[in-house]
Amino acid sequence: MASLIQVRDLLALRSRMEAAQISQTLNTPQPMINAMLQQLESMGKAVRIQEEPDGCLSGSCKSCPEGKACLREWWALR
């Protein structure tokens, strides 16, 4: 089980990561990592970075049957 400090330190080392990557690296369930990231965000220590839909190569993200599943969400330290 990872701690909040370990999540923060990992973000400091790797500059930005997805929640799934953090979960896999720290061998911690993703819902726990999501909660920790939200806590870091509320403390003003981390920021959520979302890709813009105009970054889609095919330009069809808006009509994609998966919704916005192709848009990635990154986390970084503030």
UniProtKB/Swiss-Prot annotation:
Coiled-coil annotated residue ranges, if any = none
Pfam families in UniProt: FeoC (PF09012)
Q: Give the record's keywords alphabetically.
A: DNA-binding, Iron, Iron-sulfur, Metal-binding, Repressor, Transcription, Transcription regulation
What InterPro entries does UniProt report for this protein, alphabetically?
FeoC, Tscrpt_reg_HTH_FeoC, WH-like_DNA-bd_sf, WH_DNA-bd_sf
Annotated iron-sulfur cluster binding lies at 56, 61, 64, 70
| Keyword Repressor part of the UniProt annotation | yes
Function, as annotated: May function as a transcriptional regulator that controls feoABC expression.
Q: Give the protein name, as stated in the record.
A: Probable [Fe-S]-dependent transcriptional repressor
Per the UniProt entry, what species is this protein from, by scientific name?
A: Escherichia coli O127:H6 (strain E2348/69 / EPEC)
Gene name tied to this protein? feoC
